[in-house]
Amino acid sequence: MVSTVPASPSPTTTALVEQLMAHIQGDVLASDLDRAIYSTDASMYRVLPRCVVAPRDTADIVQTLQLVHAHHSSIIPRGGGTSLSGQSVGTGVVLDLSKYMNRVLELNATKRWVWVEAGAIQAHVNNMASQHGLKIGPDPSSTRMASVGGMIGNNSTGAHSILYGMIADHVKAVEVVLWDGSVVMFDPKTPDELEQITQHDTLEARLYREIPSLVRTYAEDIRTRYPKVWRNVAGYNLDRVLKLMERGESFTLAPLIVGSEGTLGVVTRVKLNLVEIPKHTHLSVVHFNSLRESMEAVPT
């Protein structure tokens, strides 16, 4: 196990903890025991955080990001802690969205979508959706513990990815808190909506002005250098943004948030497409003469 040396909170950390306790409604955990509990996930790593915040709502996240930014620290969003690569541990402030921000907000069975908070566990969402014959498509092995926010961060998929693809293929909208504490909704925007947003002097406006320009500038590199595979969780999804622009579809930055591992903002709410639960399933054992022959049989 890779581990950091245990350390008592510094005076600056103590000051940060006191300010967090004074400004948010959720829990602020800073004891050695709490820090040790949150120093691990399903990976081999052990890294003690400065402290842990369990926000009760988006307002708590806004306050936390503003205070953490003022103290020149980092934020580590955390859901179910099922990461195998250490994405939910770090030396900054761990933001545990699974404790309170775990509700299913709205489910529309007719239009087949669901609004959930980022800490909602996939199995819980699927249990509710199953009453209407629906479910979330991608099915990672950690479904019983994985949070939707974690699935967004990791661009999760599962054993049936050939049928359902990645979670990026099912995201309709994401609410995100950016580093400056601003709350934005990344969903399909009409040209008029984009024009209205970009008139303002805000971080959101800068993103909508500069990212399309950046993608256009490096369009050829994105086309030629991104892997020509459909199951890819490496890097930022600039290729998906480029495809939106080339198709002339309503522009959204949601594909860029998916797979970003919490580095671009903290996801608070997600609108997901739902799929029908198969009425029948079966298992087939198919024999091939070689590994290459079996790979060639897989649809691309």
Residue ranges of model-derived segments:
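N-terminal flexible segment immediately upstream of the FAD-binding catalytic core
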Residues: M1-A70, G80-V114, S141, T263-T281
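Cytochrome P450 catalytic domain signature, combining two hallmark sequence patches
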Residues: H72-S73, G133
